[in-house]
């Protein structure tokens, strides 16, 4: 009974946080995005005026749009393609302030937390670029190529 159960998610987060590869990702992002990160730290989006970071709230807008687009793509049929494209676009627009707020938070992190944040940012960068490609491929009579990208 005294053995604590550690979930798979907790083990993955711990492994990412302790990985030297994650440190390499963090170092590369610091090098690549250095000036943006410095600006993000001073931006109005990096504030705790609400008692906490605004980054988690902004992610709800971005992810909500992309989830809605996914649902419309899967279940909405051809009549929902325009709405799905609109949601992808709004999600992409929202991803900018979301990333800035996250970068400002990340700039103040260190150690394991910073490595996990760097891997998180890498994943969201990849998703953003895939969705940008999806949006570009959507116009026209055959929007399936834009949907198939993700």
Where are these regions (language model features)?
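Short amphipathic, positively biased membrane-proximal segments
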Residues: 1-150
């Amino acid at each position: 009974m005294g053995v604590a159960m550690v979930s798979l998610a907790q083990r993955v987060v711990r492994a990412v946080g302790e990985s030297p590869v994650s440190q390499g990702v963090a170092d590369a992002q610091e090098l690549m995005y250095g000036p943006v990160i410095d600006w993000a730290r001073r931006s109005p989006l990096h504030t705790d005026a609400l008692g906490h970071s605004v980054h988690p709230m902004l992610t709800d807008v971005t992810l909500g749009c992309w989830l809605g687009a996914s649902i419309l793509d899967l279940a909405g049929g051809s009549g929902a393609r325009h709405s799905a494209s609109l949601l992808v676009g709004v999600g992409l627009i929202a991803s900018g302030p979301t990333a800035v707020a996250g970068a400002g938070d990340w700039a103040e992190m260190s150690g394991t937390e910073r490595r996990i944040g760097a891997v998180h940012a890498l994943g969201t960068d990849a998703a953003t670029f895939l969705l940008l490609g999806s949006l570009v491929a959507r116009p026209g009579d055959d929007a399936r190529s834009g949907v198939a990208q993700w």
